[in-house]
């Protein structure tokens, strides 16, 4: 399992915790507003909005909240916020790289809060470009293994995924334990998602992410704990949408941290 997969597994676990705190809801609503603003409020003609809505529904965001976010972003309802996307770069313990994606209406606030969270938790801010060059934009689709077909339980296999998506541009399928993660070129993410739907396979999320091209091994539990504390501190900021890292943490170390 690649370092990205291990981090992806952890992010899925963290998302479940964030959802309970309401943290994830706010991030999902922001994604919907931005997608509607950039491509229009009709999900049928705006695949980015379609996927943002589907992801929110999977996390049980109420339909009325989703509808309001679409209207605000599409200019059909007042109260919309003019967000901008900003990327910050940092290093953590043992040289681990962090790429921080923000959606904010206040650039100065976002910069100050990210810098404070990084420096107070054992990290250092990096020069622009020094970290981003270690990542590449990829299409990432997540599929839960346990599904239903014809009202009966159906466990999705890697072969099912490959058969459905290989011709659509899937490049790599990673086993995350309870789900599969499919990587493709960023431009192929909609094609991969559509191919899954055509095969009757449900998906959890489909989006473009930054994937590490060079992993940094983190085999010591105490160092891994510091890395996670740093990531948590940054990811919990209101302006932060995503934190990407190239930390490659072995399963046994991950389990000890989870415990």
Swiss-Prot record:
Natural source organism: Nocardioides sp. (strain ATCC BAA-499 / JS614)
Subcellular location: Cytoplasm
Gene Ontology cellular component annotations, sorted alphabetically: cytosol
Protein name as it appears in the record: Probable transcriptional regulatory protein Noca_2383
Keywords per UniProt: Cytoplasm, DNA-binding, Transcription, Transcription regulation
GO molecular function: DNA binding
Swiss-Prot/TrEMBL GO biological process terms: regulation of DNA-templated transcription
The family this protein is said to belong to: Belongs to the TACO1 family.
Domain of life, source organism: Bacteria
Coiled coil ranges: none
Classification via InterPro entries: Integrase-like_N, TACO1_YebC-like_2nd/3rd_dom, TACO1_YebC_N, Transcrip_reg_TACO1-like, Transcrip_reg_TACO1-like_dom3, YebC-like
Pfam families with a match to the protein in the record: TACO1_YebC_N (PF20772), Transcrip_reg (PF01709)
């Amino acid at each position: 399992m690649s370092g990205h997969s291990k981090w992806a597994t952890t992010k899925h676990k963290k998302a479940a915790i964030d959802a309970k705190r309401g943290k994830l809801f706010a991030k999902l609503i922001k994604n919907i507003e931005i997608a509607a603003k950039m491509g229009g409020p009709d999900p049928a003609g705006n695949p980015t909005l379609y996927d943002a809505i589907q992801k929110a529904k999977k996390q049980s965001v109420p339909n009325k909240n989703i509808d309001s976010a679409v209207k605000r972003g599409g200019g059909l309802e007042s109260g919309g916020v003019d967000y901008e996307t900003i990327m910050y770069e940092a290093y953590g313990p043992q040289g681990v790289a962090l790429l921080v994606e923000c959606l904010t209406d206040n650039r100065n606030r976002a910069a100050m809060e990210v810098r404070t969270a990084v420096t107070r938790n054992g990290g250092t801010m990096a020069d622009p470009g020094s970290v981003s060059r270690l990542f590449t934009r990829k299409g990432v689709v997540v599929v839960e293994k346990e599904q239903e077909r014809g009202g009966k339980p159906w466990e999705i296999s890697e072969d099912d995924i490959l058969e459905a998506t290989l011709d659509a541009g899937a490049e790599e399928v990673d086993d995350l334990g309870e789900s599969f993660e499919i990587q493709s070129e960023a431009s192929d993410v909609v094609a991969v998602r559509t191919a899954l739907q055509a095969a009757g396979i449900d998906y959890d999320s489909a989006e473009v992410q930054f994937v590490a091209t060079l992993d940094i091994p983190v085999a010591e539990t105490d160092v891994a704990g510091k890395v996670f504390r740093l990531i948590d501190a940054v990811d919990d900021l209101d302006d932060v949408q995503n934190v990407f890292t190239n930390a490659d943490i072995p399963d046994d170390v991950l389990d000890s941290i989870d415990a």
